[in-house]
Amino acid sequence: MSFIDTRKLKVIERKPGWHGRYFDSPSMTFAHYEFEKGATIHEHSHPEEEVWQVIEGSLEITIGAVTKTVGRGLVGIVPPNTRHRVVALSDGKAIVTDTPRRIFEGKP
């Protein structure tokens, strides 16, 4: 068992307006994001399942052909290999979890 102080993790801006702190467990990748209004993540897919949980603010998340406004209390679940897109409707914070662990450029 281990504990991680996410406040001490390096902040990485992988895409404009998305400031993330990243860490892994043996089977998952976690991203704690602070996002800026208007920031987008282009439509894409990947082999990992992805879960979006908004902590503050709101996001417009498109999963496949369904678009929803996601705020505190609503979780977006992206199945593996499914096209999805995210637009920040306000400034805010979100936790994103990928399983299995996700490998991408720029992640510590």
Language model segments and positions:
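A short, N-terminal "cap"/entry segment at the start of jelly-roll beta-barrel domains
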Residues: M1-S27, A31, I77, K107-P108
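Conserved short histidine dyad/triad with adjacent acidic residue
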Residues: P16, F30-H46
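Short strand-coil-strand connectors
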Residues: P26, T62-V66
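Short, conserved beta-strand element in jelly-roll/cupin
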Residues: E34-E36, H46-I61
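A cytosolic small-molecule/anion-sensing beta-strand core signal
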Residues: I55-E56, G71, S90
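Short acidic-glycine-tyrosine-enriched beta hairpin
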Residues: A65-P80
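Ligand-binding loop in jelly-roll beta-barrel domains
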Residues: P80-F104
